């Protein structure tokens, strides 16, 4: 890694010496001189010698890691936690290694949902053809038939998939804090049916063929002369980009295209689809949601699109550091009123768990999750959330509105 930086420094000195010998050239001459010098070095080969191949194991055993009895990821030989900087000064390679491990973690969690939590995988769309892109969710056997209670879990956005709250926590902390497994097990013990959404599984990536790459650049109705000028500019731009890529990405990766999953192309679409085809069809008299971060936004969008159905079916909603915004999402007055009575948002805060946290928005009450770390809010608020659900159901059965938490000084909002 240090070698090619030294080469670049040497090239800079050469250019400066050339300037001193020839006087002060204009910008065009400087650029020409530098390009000429750099063109004599095969940067592709230089970087490939420095960066190891982007080839990683596809199993935990291959990485020499496993989860111990406490659910912590540990090295099989040393017993040490995961080390990100496996190779000094190779951040990109280390990041790719981390991402490869993350994909294995995702599959591992899927396995735990089926084996330990006894959930079943259900394919989406429900009428998917053999060749179209597909997604899936996880459900307990009684998810649609349980007459009493149903728990629905929605994680945030990013790389996390069904069953996860935060990949970072799974790798660096443990399975309990980073996955939804404690929620699923607790819900099962207390007689809930369970549905685990998978809102980030929106598309599959396939490698582009040469014909598709060519088509994407040729598909234009512009006049030939204009297209030629445009092509020339694009070629020059590509040449400069490729020149830079030799530094940033010496091992050129394959060009891919995204094929979106029908009716599940975004977290919001996914939530509505699962509601329409599963949750709304369930027998449960009381449906409860736990939605983390962007999952809260997806729930609010669901409520906007299916307001009457949600009000009739959902008993309470626990949000954890939700990023929803009732103004930006244009949630109506009746939705905001319902959220104030039936939702609670456990937010990252330095205050003790369940302490009231002031909010400027006229939506659901906010209380502390007992942690300042966003990704830990679902885990730290875990016991309070199930208590909130129990109180909500008791209040519904006795026709008395529940207090969102055990706090005092409930925030009063003025309608604007």
Swiss-Prot record:
The active-site annotation reads: 293 (nucleophile)
Name where it's found.
Answer: Nucleus; Cytoplasm
Q: Which segment of the chain is annotated as a signal peptide?
A: 1-23
Q: Where is the composition biased (Basic and acidic residues)?
A: 223-236
Q: Which SUPFAM superfamilies match?
A: alpha/beta-Hydrolases
Provide the residues annotated with a glycan attachment (glycosylation).
397
Gene Ontology CC annotations of this record: cytoplasm; endoplasmic reticulum; nucleus
Q: Where is this region: Disordered?
A: 211-248
Primary location group: nucleus
**The UniProt record lists the keyword Hydrolase:** no
InterPro entries reported for this sequence: AB_hydrolase_fold, Arb2, Arb2_dom
Gene Ontology terms: biological process:
mRNA processing; neural crest cell development; regulation of alternative mRNA splicing, via spliceosome; regulatory ncRNA-mediated heterochromatin formation; RNA splicing
Q: Which PANTHER family match?
A: COTRANSCRIPTIONAL REGULATOR FAM172A (PTHR21357:SF3), FAM172 FAMILY PROTEIN HOMOLOG CG10038 (PTHR21357)
Q: What does this protein do?
A: May play role in the regulation of alternative splicing. May have hydrolase activity.
Similarity comment: family membership = Belongs to the ARB2A family.
The identity of this protein, by name, is Cotranscriptional regulator ARB2A homolog
Organism field:
Gallus gallus (Chicken)
């Amino acid at each position: 890694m240090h070698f090619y930086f030294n080469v670049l420094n040497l090239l800079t000195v050469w250019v400066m010496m050339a300037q001193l010998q020839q006087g002060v050239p204009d910008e065009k001459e400087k650029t020409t001189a530098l390009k000429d010098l750099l063109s004599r070095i095969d940067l592709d080969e230089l970087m490939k010698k420095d960066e190891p191949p982007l080839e990683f194991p596809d199993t935990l055993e291959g990485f020499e890691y496993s989860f111990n009895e406490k659910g912590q990821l540990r090295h099989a030989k040393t017993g040490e936690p995961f080390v990100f900087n496996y190779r000094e000064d190779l951040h990109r390679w280390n990041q790719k290694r981390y991402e490869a491990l993350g994909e294995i973690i995702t599959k591992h969690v899927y396995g735990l949902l089926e084996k330990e939590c006894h959930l079943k995988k259900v394919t989406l769309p429900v009428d998917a053809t053999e060749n179209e892109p597909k997604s899936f969710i996880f459900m307990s056997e009684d998810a649609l038939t349980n007459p009493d209670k149903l728990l629905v879990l929605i994680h945030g956005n990013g790389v996390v998939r069904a069953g996860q709250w935060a990949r970072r926590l799974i790798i660096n902390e443990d399975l309990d804090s980073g996955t939804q497994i404690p929620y699923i097990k607790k819900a099962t013990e207390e007689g809930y049916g369970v549905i685990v959404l998978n809102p980030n599984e929106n598309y599959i990536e396939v490698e582009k063929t040469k014909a598709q790459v060519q088509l994407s650049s040729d598909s234009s109705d512009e006049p030939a002369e204009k297209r030629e000028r445009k092509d020339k500019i694009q070629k020059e731009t590509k040449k400069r980009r490729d020149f830079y890529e030799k530094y940033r990405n010496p091992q050129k990766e394959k060009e891919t295209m995204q094929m979106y999953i029908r009716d599940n192309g975004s977290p919001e679409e996914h939530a509505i689809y699962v509601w329409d085809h599963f949750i709304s069809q369930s027998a449960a008299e009381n449906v409860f949601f736990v939605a983390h971060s962007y999952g809260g936004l997806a729930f609010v969008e669901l409520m906007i699109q299916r307001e009457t159905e949600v009000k009739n079916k959902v008993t309470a909603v626990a949000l954890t550091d939700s990023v929803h915004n009732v103004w930006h999402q244009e949630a109506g007055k009746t939705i905001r009123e319902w959220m104030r009575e039936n939702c609670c948002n456990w937010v990252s805060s330095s205050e003790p768990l369940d302490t009231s946290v002031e909010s400027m928005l006229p939506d659901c009450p906010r209380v502390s999750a007992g942690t300042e770390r966003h990704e830990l809010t679902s885990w730290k608020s875990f016991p309070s959330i199930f208590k909130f659900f129990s109180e909500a159901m008791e209040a519904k059965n006795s026709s008395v509105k529940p207090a969102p938490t055990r706090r005092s000084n409930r925030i009063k909002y003025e309608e604007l």
